[in-house]
């Protein structure tokens, strides 16, 4: 759905790097390299990015909103 502000496991703030991650991912960069550059080091935090659906620059939330 909407990208979380904090990691569900450790509570670290992760939303502050989400826009840059999304833009660089859209440009075709490797997700692993992006997260390394953004210094997202914990596996639990990296999981939050890896499991968040982005399909053709649309999030799951964008699809669900259509069915009010």
Swiss-Prot record:
SUPFAM superfamilies: RNA polymerase subunit RPB10 (SSF46924). GO terms for cellular component: cytoplasm; DNA-directed RNA polymerase complex. It catalyses: RNA(n) + a ribonucleoside 5'-triphosphate = RNA(n+1) + diphosphate. Keywords: Cytoplasm, DNA-directed RNA polymerase, Metal-binding, Nucleotidyltransferase, Transcription, Transferase, Zinc. It is an enzyme of class 2 (transferase). Its EC number is 2.7.7.6. Zn(2+) binds at residues 7, 10, 44-45. One of its GO terms (biological process) is DNA-templated transcription. One of its GO terms (molecular function) is DNA binding. It is found in: Cytoplasm. Binds 1 zinc ion. InterPro entries: RNA_pol_su_RPB10 (IPR023580), RNA_pol_suN_Zn-BS (IPR020789), RPABC5/Rpb10 (IPR000268). PROSITE patterns: RNA_POL_N_8KD. DNA-dependent RNA polymerase (RNAP) catalyzes the transcription of DNA into RNA using the four ribonucleoside triphosphates as substrates. Belongs to the archaeal Rpo10/eukaryotic RPB10 RNA polymerase subunit family. Part of the RNA polymerase complex. This is DNA-directed RNA polymerase subunit Rpo10.
């Amino acid at each position: 759905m909407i990208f979380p502000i904090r990691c569900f496991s450790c509570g670290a703030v992760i939303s502050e790097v989400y826009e840059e991650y999304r833009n660089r991912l859209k440009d075709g960069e490797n997700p692993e390299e992006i997260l390394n550059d953004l210094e997202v080091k914990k596996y639990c935090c990296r999981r939050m990015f890896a499991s968040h659906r982005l399909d053709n620059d649309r999030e799951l939330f964008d699809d669900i909103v259509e069915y009010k």
